[in-house]
């Protein structure tokens, strides 16, 4: 076994991990990045459509173009990294953290003062949404179908049904249509699309692909291969209405039914997770409840845009490097509270008055709202106020403020009310 020592270890070589490693390096830390796949870039390697980088670079880039800019900078800085490497154990000890890594070079014992969790997220599967029927070939997550088409150059279907209107599902509806497949429809159990409005228009409406709201797949037919699926409309409690059932012949069912942050290593280290985001509970520096462990990107919460993933990677890397310098004051955290009837989640969940001033806050509304004013306050002092013409659970919103630590006297509250 080989033993290695670093200031910061970054787990994940996608857009968040690359940004975190670059940021930590630029702030003086000795960094190791660990990536389990054979190439850097994360999921962006297979996202050949454009639309990335509008916020970060002010231009429309494909996924490989966006990640390529970070990879080139990362390599030019000479930051140490391991690909085809998997963390099998992680523990906190008196002088930092010890990670056991299985790699092509053998078993590595990696020690560090800080760890950045940037492992991204994974897709829900058919077993996690309780679809009845056999388990024939032809049931894919949207990401798997995307990998077949964009990386392997293979067509996984000629006639498919897509369950769920997440962004990847809608993007794959367009991609499969362009490659000659027939997409019978996109079926969404909720009464509003789950993905961005621009994807509804650009991927579905522009290609005449039908979107069926308040409808779900209830059964899969086929033994060796998918032959058909049963779809039903649902009531207000999202229970299938049996009288509306109909059979749709197809050779594949593609699932776009949500994403889950990857936090197995975080849990090994004792990181507390937020039931709302399925990611870590953090303060504005993105440090978790375990001192020295930071979380960013889709491992923290599922983002709509990769630009925000990179932004949180920047913050986590900078914070990890500062933590390693050892001059951080004792934490003085106040909780961030919000109305759970109106907000699905708010990140960060705490504000540390002893840490870096200012805050970038992310939130997702629980449903559709029109003409709303969102206020972040401490006591009677409004720290941030922003007005929104439209709010939707399909789109994450961002609030920013500087120089607020001296104004925080009590817990922070996030509220939403009709604009006057």
Where are these regions (language model features)?
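A Rossmann-like FAD-binding core segment of flavoenzymes
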Residues: 74-101, 177-264, 357-390
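FAD-site-proximal beta/loop scaffold in flavoenzymes
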Residues: 117, 139-149, 252-303
């Amino acid at each position: 076994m080989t033993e290695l020592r670093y200031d910061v270890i970054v787990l994940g070589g996608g857009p968040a991990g690359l940004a975190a490693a670059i940021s930590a390096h630029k702030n003086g830390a000795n960094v190791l990045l660990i990536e389990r796949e054979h190439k850097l870039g994360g999921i962006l390697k297979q996202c050949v459509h454009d639309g990335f980088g509008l916020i970060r670079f002010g231009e429309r880039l494909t996924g490989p173009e966006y990640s390529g800019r970070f990879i080139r900078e990362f390599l030019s800085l000479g930051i140490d990294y391991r690909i085809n490497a998997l963390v099998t154990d992680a523990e906190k000890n008196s002088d930092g953290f010890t990670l056991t890594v299985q790699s092509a070079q053998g078993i590595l014992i990696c020690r560090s003062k800080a760890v950045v969790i940037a492992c991204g997220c994974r897709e829900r599967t058919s077993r996690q949404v309780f679809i009845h029927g056999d388990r024939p070939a032809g049931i894919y997550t949207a990401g798997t179908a995307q990998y077949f088409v964009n990386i392997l150059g293979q067509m996984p279907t000629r006639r498919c049904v897509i369950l769920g209107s997440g962004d990847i599902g809608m993007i794959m509806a367009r991609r499969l249509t362009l490659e000659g497949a027939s997409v019978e429809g996109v079926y969404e159990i909720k009464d509003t699309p789950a993905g961005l409005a621009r994807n509804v228009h650009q991927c579905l409406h522009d290609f005449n692909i039908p979107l069926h709201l308040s409808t779900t797949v209830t059964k899969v037919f086929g033994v060796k291969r998918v032959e058909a699926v049963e779809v039903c409309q649902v009531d207000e409690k999202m229970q299938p209405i049996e009288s509306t059932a109909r059979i749709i012949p197809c050779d594949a069912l593609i699932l776009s039914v949500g994403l889950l942050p990857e936090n197995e290593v975080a849990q090994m280290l004792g990181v507390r997770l937020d039931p709302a985001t399925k990611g870590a509970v953090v303060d504005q520096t993105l440090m978790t409840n375990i001192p020295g462990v930071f979380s960013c990107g889709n491992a923290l919460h599922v983002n709509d845009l990769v630009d925000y993933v990179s932004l949180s990677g920047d913050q986590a890397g900078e914070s990890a490097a500062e933590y390693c310098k050892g001059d951080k004051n004792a934490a003085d955290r106040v909780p961030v509270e919000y109305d759970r009837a109106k907000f699905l989640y708010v990140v960060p969940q705490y504000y540390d008055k002893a840490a870096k001033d200012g805050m970038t806050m992310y939130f997702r509304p629980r449903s559709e709202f029109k003409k709303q004013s969102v206020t972040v306050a401490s006591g009677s002092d409004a720290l941030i106020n922003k007005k929104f013409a439209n709010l939707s659970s399909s789109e994450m919103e961002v609030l920013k403020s500087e120089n607020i630590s001296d104004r925080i006297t009590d817990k922070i509250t996030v509220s939403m009310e009709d604009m006057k």
